[in-house]
Regions:
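Acidic, small-residue rich beta-repeat scaffolds with periodic aromatic anchors
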Residues: 17, 22-118
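Extracellular-facing segments of soluble proteins and assemblies that are Gly/Ser/Thr-biased and enriched
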Residues: 1-16
């Protein structure tokens, strides 16, 4: 698996994550067949500093996440986890600290051939 860092910006929020690819093993026509296959994207962090105006418009919140890989029983594809840190907005004028309880797990869905949140 290859996890390529990605980042973007939309509506005053910068975000970061990974685009996920797997290498196609076995015989193939490299002219017609993809050597790498896209299997999804995951978000690992965001920052609303450009939209929050120092907390005057909305609470400022920044989070980042650590990407982890683990073997998954019954699958050749690893289980992915994103363990966040930082803060998130929970309501008007409110934020809270993120921790291990906020960890998000992603598993490969063979039907869609993409990673999905579990």
């Amino acid at each position: 698996m290859l996890a390529v860092p990605t980042e973007g910006f939309e509506n005053g929020v910068s975000f970061e994550g990974y685009a996920l690819f797997v290498f196609n093993i076995g015989p193939r026509d490299e002219v017609k067949d993809n050597v790498w296959t896209y299997v999804g994207s995951i978000l690992t962090g965001d920052d609303n500093a450009a939209a929050c105006d120092g907390g005057d418009v909305m609470p400022c919140a920044t989070r980042s996440g650590k990407l982890g890989f683990a073997a998954q029983t019954g699958s050749d594809m690893p289980r992915l986890t994103v363990t966040p840190s930082g803060t998130m907005i929970t309501g008007p004028g409110k934020t809270r600290q993120l921790g291990a309880a906020d960890t998000v797990t992603y598993v490969y869905d063979a039907a869609t051939k993409k990673y999905a949140e579990k």
